[in-house]
Amino acid sequence: VEIFMGSGAYICGEESALLESMEGKRGEPRNKPPFPSEYGFKGKPTVVNNVETLAHSYTILKFGAKKFRDLGVKDSRGSKVFSVSGDTPIPGIYELELGMSVQDFVDDFGDGDTKAVQVGGASGFLVPRKRFGKTSIGYQGKLTGISLPTGGSMMIFNSSRSMYNVLNNYLDFFEEESCGQCTPCRVGCQQLLKGIRAVKRGEKPASYLDKLLKLTDTMKLTAKCGLGQSVANSFSSIVENFREEMIY
């Protein structure tokens, strides 16, 4: 076992950018195909897995698949490790069964005044209070009743939080972490950040938010990797559910 220490770049969560970094190069996504399973680390076929996947593999091999499948719900079997942060009295790391509703999660971890929950970190979706009972945390679909745990990060926001500030922070983060290799992500993140600030200052009309939503659709289709594609998740879910906070 050899451990490579990275510099913490968010883009290196993308598998091919991670391989580039391990080879001593700048962390940038590769063109696909070929995929890492064909041409990976130093040109060799490579399996890239999250450490949690390897941990699950060990427990499944040790205790059997049935014990793992007894956890969770249909199509979302097993458990997942979540980091819980934000407006919660009990922040920390928890292993939870998949399939729970966001309402159940809020009942366990909220502070009694939860306004919204970000499921899956900055790249995930923001779930507003009105959808807590209708949205589950599992592997099926998206916010049509089920929310993807794209990552194990769960951020809780109470009524004291400005959703404009939340989105501004996310976009500032994405602009900083974009590798700059592809135009949709590099320029798109900049324009989204400038756009919401212009609307907030009254320099652009509220309808300009609709143009920004169309821009995120373009980024989702044309960005080279998951970073640029996933910016649309938090942007659209925040703007569509808390539009008034983007304006006033």
What is each model feature region?
Residues 4, 85-87, 96-97, 108, ...:
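Generic beta-strand/beta-sheet core signal
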Residues 1, 111-145, 240:
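Terminal amphipathic helices with adjacent charged low-complexity linkers/tails
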Residues 100-105:
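Short, structural beta-strand-to-alpha-helix junction motif
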Residues 1-98, 109-111:
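Hydrophobic alpha-helical positions that pack around
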Residues 8-11, 123-128, 217-226:
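Short, surface-exposed loop/turn segments at secondary-structure boundaries that line and modulate
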Residues 135, 139-248:
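Ferredoxin-type iron-sulfur electron-transfer modules in oxidoreductases and energy-metabolism complexes
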Residues 92, 125-128, 165:
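Short acidic/glycine-rich loop or secondary-structure boundary segments that cap or lie
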Residues 2-4, 9, 20, 82, ...:
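Short glycine- and Lys/Arg-enriched binding-loop motifs that mark or flank ligand-binding interfaces
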